[in-house]
UniProtKB/Swiss-Prot annotation:
Lineage, opening ranks: Eukaryota, Metazoa, Chordata, Craniata, Vertebrata
Main location: cytoplasm
A biological-process GO annotation: protein export from nucleus
Nucleus found in the keyword field: yes
Protein name in UniProt: Exportin-4
Protein's organism: Xenopus laevis
Domain of life, per lineage: Eukaryota
Family statement: Belongs to the exportin family.
Length: 1150
């Protein structure tokens, strides 16, 4: 369309379209706006628009049109690169650069876009060496030395454009070239040109740093070059020979450390460069924007590592020099808010990047000064962070800086190889004390005090906390806990005295209130402020205690930290074991009132202080003072007890070289202390579930503590000896209050705990009695409900629905309790229910919550048990799952979803069904069952001879689900991704099953792959492309010339061919598309040749015809026909990269 018009008509049309796009929404309608957008799109896709674009740039006065002309040049240069003469490209680049130089008043966004076009031309030319940066650098150098701020700013813009374009494939222009192409350009650029840019930048910074007074214009130039230096020092240097798969991963790393090549040695190891950046920072530190850049430059220099250092000596010299510069910059000054994060990043980088042996090799007095400075800053930033919280600031700069410094401490103190024991103790004491002080109320602490020491505002109630402090501050607490360990001598007694004192005060407050109530019922004169302060103090003291005494362990065996064990052993000669046990076993008494209390084990006394808090809470509930208690404190206590139980209770001597006698006596196997604690903890659980049943989070933490008590067989053996345990089991089985008021998720976990307890060691009669009391009532009540003659009439009554829901939740809990040694009993028990659950699907088909929960039962059973089941049991489960899916499909197929809620309900169901099918599929590669041996004692019978695999079941399941997958449902990203992951998974693992599918299912599956490839997100498209390779390979193996799969693969060859050659696609997909394309070409060589021939014969332009023909010949240049050989495939993929660089986008023009 544009090609037929003269230049002046084109300009008129573009300016008119720009006017529409720039007009306010009230002045133009949608249709006009879309037409205007189409005009620009059409213009940018026009063939060889260079002459008309130059004319536009020279004559048009409309900025937006100038911007579009620059964009059109940039896109066309890349698209038509192989058609252009090198001299034309060079003159185009010169024209653009000259254009900008001659028009200093161009709008910023127009100038940046023209310079981006220059950068793209330079980048595209860098690989075939047709264009280099030398002449540009010469011009830039002249602009810099002109001393004209406008010209210097322009020079900076040119360098910035080059830097952005070459820096990474994520920031680069979307010019349709591969990751490998961007990587190659970047490597060429970073060795020479990047260093030149840095040297030019350093020149400017040196000149400006020498000047006394800078006017606003000069400050602006200075700031731009400082930002440019920051960009260079933050360059993510690409290592040599990094494959395309890793380039994206490498470049996505957030915190880039400075790791330049050897060629930078002379530049960056020059001490004057480092000194310059310290000088610059001192000069501009009060300007918060510039300070950010100067500190970031220093942080990057603090992370310098890699081949740039020739030996250790050079590293030591560099580090010592840097620390001297840092200390002289920050000692004796008041740090600005805007500096806090930057300074903490510098320190963090020094500690993280430089190896310990280098850190310890610098002069010892310098290292001591550095650690003292770190201590001072940590305490200072901690106080400022506490202040930020009080003032509820949005931008928590000190909190971020404090977190960074605490992480640095963690890195330092965990190294006992280079620093002798006790090296950091005094520093740890200071940081620990400061942390505790900031978290306690006045007068002992400074919590909620503003800078001038005034209490800020009425404390919000502790239980109103939006996000739990444990989650919010877990990293901080872990660091402070570790510092507390290395200074155990100081920190454990400190925590004990603070906690004991506050728990005693809390007890006193509650007692006074009780007496007031007895004296005058109805009067309520308690001071809530005092209570709130006490609760908040106890909250923080318990959190720190929990992190100091034990680690977070996910899936590992938790061990008592070595520092705590050593501390207890060191003390043990002066410890009276009996007094220690007396304090542990008397939570109702003040520790200080017990004779000889000072000769107790300090760690056990600290644990006793938490038990004392727990006891005060329990007594208050018995005295009807629950309304005065803090659920948050209840949560903290249970969290601590769970964390502590995992690590200390029934301590396993085999795991330790040496063990503390007090620990062994108090918490070891077969000890009175251990029996007492388990009884106490169980009592606490039962009390909490009764008192706090309405506090969901607290009840949840409580049942998690119960699971911890029984998940290890040794502990469970002691738990089941408690009468309370049996009472709890009976009470729950009878659904009597208050347990029946617990939320469904809490009931589910409680069921899990009760089932785990049932596998403790007991004689067969006792075990039989236990299952009779725990599982049988569940089965009995369930059957009583569903077998009533009028069940269909009463099934929707609230009471009945609650009974059904409670049973389904309990079944999920039973499944969650599965272990290899209990799976036989649990599977047989659950299978009886699964059949009945399928019947419930019919009854409750209009009740989405119940349907969802029924599917969830199946998901849990498959997830937890399938890997242990032998063939016959697996078949039973497969059949039950398939029946479930058939019933679900029958009830939902063709059903009209009237509202959004109904659609979301089905989305939830299908997401669970996908999970169920994926769990079943896992049987094919995670199978712990050799035979059905584990089941024989429980159910005699032979496995069937049908060799049905999980894949058959899953494919049948997909057949049932596929018709339910509407286009609307696939708009839910998580469901769409889960669905395509599942079918790709099936194609990759069982390609041989696909040709054997029923015709309808086969067609649906192929349609799904095509839909995913052409109409879904790039992630889904990639999954579908990955599914094609194994399917094509399966065809090649089968050598069946007449199969529907082969016909489908021919169709996909055309789709992938079009995607690669004719359509603009995401370059990240080129690899997956290339691999699929190669396999499809191997399989359909004649069809591929036909596609190429058809494409070539449709070309009218002889130049494009020839270039395309050459590119295709080069792509399949091998004299031997392509085969499914890895080496040949890799060679093809490399040629495809080049092919895409030369012709990608060439055919996408209008």
């Amino acid at each position: 369309m544009m090609a037929a018009l003269g230049a002046s008509e084109v300009i008129a049309q573009l300016e008119s379209a720009a006017k529409v796009l720039m007009a306010p929404p009230s002045m133009v309608n949608n249709e006009q706006r879309q037409h205007a957008e189409h005009v620009f799109l059409s213009f940018r896709k026009s063939k060889s628009p260079f002459a008309v674009c130059k004319h536009i740039l020279e004559t048009s006065k409309v900025d937006y049109v100038l911007f579009q002309a620059a964009t059109a040049i940039m896109e066309a240069v890349v698209r038509e690169w192989i058609l252009l003469e090198k001299s034309s490209i060079e003159s185009l680049r010169t024209f653009l650069l000259t254009y900008v130089l001659q028009r200093p008043n161009l709008q910023k966004y127009v100038r940046e876009q023209i310079l981006l076009a220059v950068a793209v031309i330079v980048k595209r030319g860098s690989l075939d060496k047709s264009i280099d940066c030398k002449s540009i650098f010469h011009e830039v150098s002249q602009l810099i030395s002109s001393c004209n701020p406008t010209m210097q700013t322009l020079a900076c813009s040119i360098l910035t454009a080059l830097l952005i374009e070459f820096s990474s494939s994520s920031k680069t222009s979307n010019i349709g070239l591969s990751m490998e192409f961007h990587g190659s350009c970047k490597r060429v650029f970073q060795d020479e040109d990047l260093r030149r840019i840095f040297m030019l930048t350093i020149e400017v910074l040196q000149e400006f740093s020498r000047r006394e007074n800078l006017n606003a214009q000069m400050s602006s130039v200075f700031q731009r070059y400082l930002a440019l230096a920051n960009q260079v020092l933050s360059w993510n240097f690409l290592p040599p020979n990094l494959g395309r798969h890793y380039i994206a991963m490498f470049e996505s790393s957030q915190n880039v450390m400075l790791k330049p090549t050897e060629s930078w040695r002379e530049t960056l190891l020059n001490s004057r460069v480092m000194e310059l950046f310290f000088t610059v920072h001192r000069k501009i530190r009060e300007d918060s924007d510039m300070a950010q850049d100067s500190l970031q430059c220093l942080a990057q220099l603090a992370s310098l590592h890699g081949p740039i250092f020739p030996d250790e000596r050079s590293q030591v010299d560099y580090l010592a020099h840097f620390i001297e510069g840092l200390l002289s910059t920050i000692n004796g000054i008041e740090i600005e808010d805007s500096e806090a994060v930057g300074i903490s990043n510098i320190i963090s980088n020094l500690i993280t990047v430089f190896p310990r042996n280098i850190l310890t090799a610098i002069p010892s007095d310098l290292f001591s000064s550095f650690v003292n400075c770190l201590t001072h800053l940590t305490c200072s930033f901690g106080r400022s962070a506490a202040l930020e919280e009080v003032l509820d600031k949005d931008d928590m700069v000190y909190m971020e800086a404090y977190d960074k410094l605490l992480e640095s401490w963690l890195t330092l103190v965990q190294d006992d190889q280079h620093f002798h024991k006790g090296f950091f103790t005094q520093h740890a004491v200071q940081v620990f004390n400061s942390y505790i002080q900031c978290h306690l109320a006045a007068p002992d602490g400074t919590r909620n005090l503003t800078a001038n020491g005034v209490a800020s505002r009425e404390e919000e109630e502790i239980n109103e906390i939006q996000e739990d402090d444990r989650d919010l501050f877990s990293d901080q607490l872990a660091s402070v806990g570790m510092l507390g360990r290395i200074a155990s001598d100081h920190c454990i007694p400190l925590l004990t005295s603070l906690l004991e004192e506050r728990v005693t005060r809390l007890h006193g407050q509650l007692q006074r209130h009780q007496q007031q109530l007895l004296a005058s019922p109805g009067a309520d004169s308690i001071d809530n402020k005092v209570l709130d302060d006490l609760y908040e103090d106890i909250h923080w003291l318990i959190l720190v205690t929990g992190y100091l005494l034990a680690d977070d362990t996910q899936g590992e065996t938790p061990l008592i930290p070595s520092e705590i064990m050593e501390y207890s052993i060191k003390q043990s000669t002066e410890v009276d074991i009996n007094t220690t046990l007396q304090i542990l076993g008397s939570p109702g008494e003040k520790a200080s009132s017990i004779p000889g209390c000072n000769r107790t084990d300090s760690v056990i006394r600290l644990v006793s202080a938490v038990l004392r808090a727990s006891e005060v809470e329990s007594r208050a509930t018995r005295a009807d003072l629950t309304h005065l208690l803090s659920p948050q404190m209840g949560k903290d206590i249970v969290w601590f007890l769970k964390r502590w139980t995992k690590t200390y209770l029934l301590v396993d001597e085999k795991l330790y070289d040496q063990i503390s006698l007090p620990f062994n006596t108090a918490f070891g196997a077969d000890t009175e202390g251990c029996h007492w604690i388990i009884g106490y903890l169980l009592e606490k659980v039962i009390s909490n579930l009764s008192v706090w049943s309405s506090e969901q989070e607290l009840a949840n933490e409580t049942v998690q503590l119960l699971v911890t008590l029984v998940e290890r067989r040794e502990r469970a053996n002691l738990v089941i000896q408690c009468e309370n345990w049996w009472n709890l089991a009976k009470q729950f089985a009878q659904r009597s209050p208050p347990l029946n008021f617990l939320s469904s998720s809490v009931q589910r976990t409680l069921m899990k705990a009760l089932v785990l307890g049932g596998f403790a060691h007991m004689d067969s009669d006792t075990k039989q009695q236990y299952w009779t009391e725990v599982l049988q009532p569940l089965q009995q009540r369930f059957l009583n409900v569903i077998n009533q003659e009028n069940f269909q009439q009463i099934c929707q009554e609230e009471e009945v629905k609650q009974e059904i829901t409670a049973t389904l939740e309990a079944l999920c809990g039973i499944a969650e309790a599965t272990q290899i040694d209990n799976v036989a009993i649990l599977f047989n028990f659950l299978m009886d229910f699964l059949t009945n659950c399928i019947g419930l699907m019919e009854v409750y088909k209009n009740n989405p919550e119940t349907v969802n929960l029924i599917i969830e039962v199946f998901v849990e059973v498959a997830h937890k048990q399938i890997c242990y089941l032998g063939e016959s049991k697996a078949m039973n489960l497969y059949e039950a799952c398939l029946t479930l899916l058939q019933v679900y499909s029958k009830n939902n197929l063709g059903r009209k979803r009237i509202d959004v809620t109904a659609e979301e309900d089905q989305y939830q169901d299908l997401l669970l069904i996908m999970e169920l099918l994926t769990n079943l599929l896992s049987k094919e590669f995670i199978d712990f069952s050799d035979t059905d041996e584990v089941f024989r004692p429980h159910e005699p019978g032979q496995a069937t001879n049908r060799p049905v695999s999980a894949a058959d079941v899953v494919l049948y399941g997909v057949n049932i689900v596929l018709p339910l997958m509407s286009q609307d449902l696939l708009k839910f990203p998580s469901l769409c991704n889960q669905y395509y992951k599942l079918i790709t998974f099936i194609c990759e693992i069982f390609p041989e099953k696909i040709p054997l599918l029923p015709e309808d299912l086969f067609k649906s599956l192929m349609y799904s792959l095509e839909l995913g490839m052409t109409s879904m997100s790039s992630e889904v498209s990639q999954l579908c492309l990955e599914a094609l390779t194994p399917l094509a390979e399966q065809c090649a193996k089968a050598q069946d010339t007449d199969s529907p799969l082969l016909a489908a693969m021919r169709h996909f060859l055309k789709l992938v061919f079009d995607m690669l050659v004719l359509q603009k696609h995401n370059t990240e997909m080129t690899t997956a598309a290339g691999e699929a394309f190669y396999t499809l070409v191997c399989l359909n060589q004649a069809e591929y040749a036909e596609l190429v021939e058809t494409l070539l014969s449709s070309q009218q332009d002889p130049l494009i015809y020839q270039r395309l023909a050459d590119a295709f010949n080069k792509l399949t240049a091998s004299s031997t026909p392509p085969t499914l050989d890895r080496k040949q495939k890799m060679s093809f993929l490399k040629s495809l990269e080049e092919f895409m660089g030369n012709v990608g986008g060439l055919l996408c023009v209008k």
